[in-house]
Design a protein with these regions (language model features):
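Terminal helices and disordered tails flanking the catalytic cores of nucleotide-processing hydrolases
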Residues: 1-109, 115, 264-452
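Acidic/His-rich, divalent-metal-binding segments that scaffold phosphate/diphosphate chemistry
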Residues: 66-216, 236, 299-303, 307, ...
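Amphipathic alpha-helix face/heptad-repeat signature
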Residues: 135-139, 165, 192, 199, ...
Length: 452
């Protein structure tokens, strides 16, 4: 299969971010920028301005624009190390996670200091930094954690460096995506994920074509949303198909999303274990060890019990049960379907059953009982676990909806056949209509038997 490559047509989203950068920082051509007909558009050394946006965006170039630019005073190792020091000075959870593996090989700070970034990657990191301090901080956090996880896997120093570089650059593909799909608080519909799931592949192409890194770096960038059980994206790779550095970056990216919240290690531990097989057990033990290392009597302020949350848990249970029934009914119906759709439904049902087991194993099923009394003596611990488990399970149902939508996007009949199931899993209008028909939650015995 031919490897996709970067286009010499300029991506408009990248170009717009670049033009915004020219208004606050000197961005210059490191060589002549020439179109495919040989016309010089920007001379070597010339400073880019907003006035050149239309010219650059309207021509197909002889070389990619990314390889022909440099920024004066952009992101570099000094900024990265300063950001890393700030993270390590303020984040107790990250220190505890890294501290569990501190004696294995080169320190994360030394690896960060030894990273090389050419003009193109420095530009990517500079644009990332311009998205706000949290954006670069996220990249550095993922890099630090990826190195820590690579140490947990006992990877070589070179593989630890690959994991760290991939962690630093894992989201550069998002620079090429319409910002509307990345807006804070934006809830993507299942079919809209098509705009986002490509960013690991874009990142892989950028790293491959713009830097002389080992191939393991680009590969790990492409794998940072994959999961060990094959439920990730973009390739749904599983098991040994995912590289060691890729596994390290994958779990690091997930951890970075919860470590800035309250009770971060508790959240991380539950997220890692809620669906067995999503991540290597090594990573769960690393988080559990960091959690055990916390002071036993540390001050806590857990959330107050809220009986209104029981309604949300009941709705979530209905959603799981109705999704299972919908998929099973499709297999029973005497309608024509392709082998691909049949396999897709079977795979979906297996994933929903795993989520059903997670619902029960986390104890959420106890809240379905009338007068369960769980709130009476709760100091907030149960409330916290309930909230985290509900969130994690909801996200995984939406993951399945996303995968169904993307796998049927090119076949209208398949998409129409699965539209109702996709809506149930995503929590959309189809779910709301189904739930209005319910007076009592589905019974638990069969599900509990399946989970046993």
């Amino acid at each position: 299969m031919q490897r996709p490559s970067l286009s010499t047509s300029v991506n408009q989203h990248y170009l717009n971010k670049l033009m915004n950068l020219t208004e606050v920082m000197d961005v210059a051509a490191s060589e002549d920028i020439v179109d495919v007909r040989g016309m010089k558009l920007v001379a070597k050394g010339a400073r880019l301005t907003r006035a050149q946006q239309e010219t650059l965006g309207g021509h197909k170039l002889k070389k990619t624009l990314e390889s022909s630019l440099s920024a004066v005073g952009g992101a570099d190792n000094g900024l990265i190390l300063a950001t890393a020091r700030r993270i390590l000075d303020t984040s107790v959870p990250i220190n505890r996670i890294l501290g569990r593996n501190a004696g294995r090989g080169i320190s994360p700070q030394t690896l960060l200091a030894n990273m090389h970034f050419g003009h193109a990657m420095r530009m990517m990191l500079t644009l990332t930094d311009r998205d706000g301090p949290e954006a670069l901080e996220h990249s550095v956090t993922v890099s630090l954690l990826a190195i820590g996880m690579a140490k947990k896997l006992q990877l070589s120093n070179d593989e630890q460096m690959a994991a760290g570089l991939a962690g630093m650059l894992h989201d550069i593909g998002e620079l090429y995506i319409d910002p509307a799909y990345l807006a804070p608080g934006k809830r993507l519909l299942p079919h809209e994920w098509a705009h986002l799931v490509v960013h690991p592949r874009i990142g892989q192409m950028l790293v491959t074509e713009l830097e002389a890194y080992p191939a393991s770096v680009a590969r790990a960038v492409s794998e940072h949303h994959e999961r060990l059980d094959g439920t990730g994206y973009p390739r749904q790779s599983a098991g040994g198909m995912i590289s060691g550095p890729g596994l390290a970056v994958s779990v690091a990216e997930m951890l970075a999303g919860v470590l800035n919240k309250d009770y971060p290690l508790e959240r991380a531990e539950l997220a890692l274990k809620i669906i067995p097989g999503e991540h290597p057990h090594h990573f769960l033990s690393a988080i559990s060890g960091a959690l055990r290392a916390q002071p036993a009597n540390r001050p806590i302020a857990l959330p107050r019990p809220d009986e209104n949350d029981d309604v949300a848990i009941t709705r979530l249970w209905w959603r799981i049960a109705d999704s299972l029934e919908s998929g099973q009914q499709m297999l029973r119906d005497d309608i024509e379907r392709s082998p691909r759709v049949w396999a897709l439904i079977q795979r979906t049902l297996a994933r929903i059953r795993n989520i059903e087991r997670a619902f029960i194993s986390t104890g959420l099923d106890a809240y379905l009982k009338n007068n369960h009394g769980l709130h009476e003596h709760d100091d907030g611990t149960l409330q916290f676990e309930k909230a985290v488990a509900t969130r994690e399970i909801t996200w995984r149902l939406r993951d399945i909806a996303r995968d169904l939508a993307l796998n049927t996007a090119d076949v209208p009949t398949d998409r129409a056949m699965l539209a109702g199931l996709i809506g149930l899993l995503d929590g959309g209008a189809s779910e709301a209509a189904a739930l209005q028909l319910r007076a009592q939650p589905p019974s638990l015995p069969q599900a509990q038997a399946r989970a046993a």
